[in-house]
Regions:
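A short, GP-enriched loop/loop-strand-helix hinge that lies immediately N-terminal to
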Residues: 1-30, 45-53
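Short glycine-/acidic-enriched loop or helix-start segments at secondary-structure transitions
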Residues: 3-7, 86-87, 123
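A general structural signal for well-ordered alpha-helical segments in protein cores
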Residues: 4-7, 32-35, 97, 135, ...
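Short, contiguous strand/loop micro-motifs
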Residues: 21-23, 87, 166-169
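Active-site nucleotide/adenylate-binding loops and adjacent lid/helix of ATP-dependent enzymes
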Residues: 28-120
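Peripheral (often C-terminal) accessory segments that flank ATP-dependent C-N-forming ligase machineries
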Residues: 62-67, 164-165, 172
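Phosphate-binding site of ATP-dependent enzymes
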Residues: 92-171
Length: 172
């Protein structure tokens, strides 16, 4: 809570200073479908995806077949408006896709189905210093389970964090 821009809006309306992102950045970043559209409009590549509204989804088995046909398996199914990987499921078999959709729809009216792209999980924080963006060191997030899910994020010892990430300067 407090990450979707509503709290920031209240604080701004009351003239109360706060740290962190403003209203628009918070609202966009907590809605994965809005984030994806924003990044695409800026020319930033993102994983191919399908945005599905709960009320337009129709028969979930038919939808699952369409998702598998378009993206293959494994595929990433995620609730559009949750954080901490809540409502994110990575089905590896066709039989797991419908339950993954049902799980994601518990948390959000909109769900994203995305092509699963294997790779390393990295995070880079950007600070503002003297009005200029300043990147902090790259952090490589290495969950022991292979997926940076809720368990990996909040269970002590389930994930290794490498900072700075052990990549050459060209990569970072």
């Amino acid at each position: 809570y407090g990450e979707d821009g509503r709290l920031q809006s209240i604080l701004e309306a009351a003239g109360i200073p706060y740290t962190g992102c403003g209203v628009l950045a918070s609202a966009v970043s907590m809605d994965k479908s809005a984030t994806k559209r924003y990044l695409q409009s800026a020319g930033i590549p993102t994983a191919p995806c399908m945005i599905i509204n709960k009320h337009d989804a129709g028969d979930l088995q038919t939808l699952a077949e369409k998702i598998i046909s378009e993206f293959g398996l494994p595929v990433v199914i995620k609730a559009a408006t949750q954080g901490s990987s809540i409502g994110v499921v990575i089905p590896k078999t066709a039989q797991e896709v419908v339950p993954a959709l049902e799980e994601a729809f518990k948390y959000s009216e909109n769900v994203l189905a995305e092509k699963c792209i294997k790779g390393k999980e990295l995070t880079i924080s950007i600070m503002e210093e003297n009005g200029e963006p300043k990147p902090l060191p790259v952090i490589w997030i290495a969950p022991h389970s292979g997926a940076y899910d809720f368990h990996s994020k909040y269970t002590k010892g389930a994930t290794d964090y490498h900072c700075p990430a052990p990549f050459d300067e060209k990569t970072t």
